Amino acid sequence: MITGIVVKNMNGYFYVQDDTGTIHECKVRGRLKKGRYSLLVGDRVTISEDGFVESIHGRHNSMVRPAVANIDQVVLVVAAHEPDINELLLNKMLVMIEHADIPIVLCINKCDLMDSDTEAMVELYKSIGYDVLMTSTYDMTGIEDLRHVLQHKVTAFAGPSGVGKSSLLNAVD
């Protein structure tokens, strides 16, 4: 038996990274599909040599959106502009993550496009205690700071479509 962490879920296959860094393509046995918990990215699991998830280890946290477990922090990404910040959606996501008791880093991407209204909003979130990181993949502002925030932590990226989550991940890679 091999233990590892689920790093990807795609088309019914779960990709499990073992302690040596090897990725195993796995399926879930029927009895686990009918169980109390569905398998999430971040779950620590035991897998068989023939590529089946045999058991799911305990979780210390989990979220529904994004569907992840056992994470150290969430980087919640919004864009300063294009698309404009939807404050209602941002606040809903903050509440959801806070409810899961997971530390949050609020990342304002595309900061090179920031206007005074967005600056005032950023100051408000800072004043109530959120860690705020300003980034831009256009001029690479804050990318080193983001690398530092990610170091030695299991992190989920969340945020609306088009805010630059993938661009940020590519920039820190």
Which residues does each PLM region occupy?
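N-terminal accessory targeting/assembly segments
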Residues: M1-I85
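Short flexible coil/turn linkers enriched for glycine and charged/polar residues
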Residues: K8-M10, N70, A100, K126-I128, ...
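Switch/coupling subdomain of P-loop NTPase systems
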Residues: V45, N70-I71, L88-I102
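Short secondary-structure boundary/capping elements
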Residues: R59, I85-L89, D117, Y138
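Conserved beta-strand/loop subsegment of P-loop NTPase cores
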Residues: D72-V77, H99-C111, Y130-S136
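Canonical P-loop GTPase G-domain recognition
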Residues: K110-V163
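A conserved segment at the C-terminal end of the G1
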Residues: K165-D173
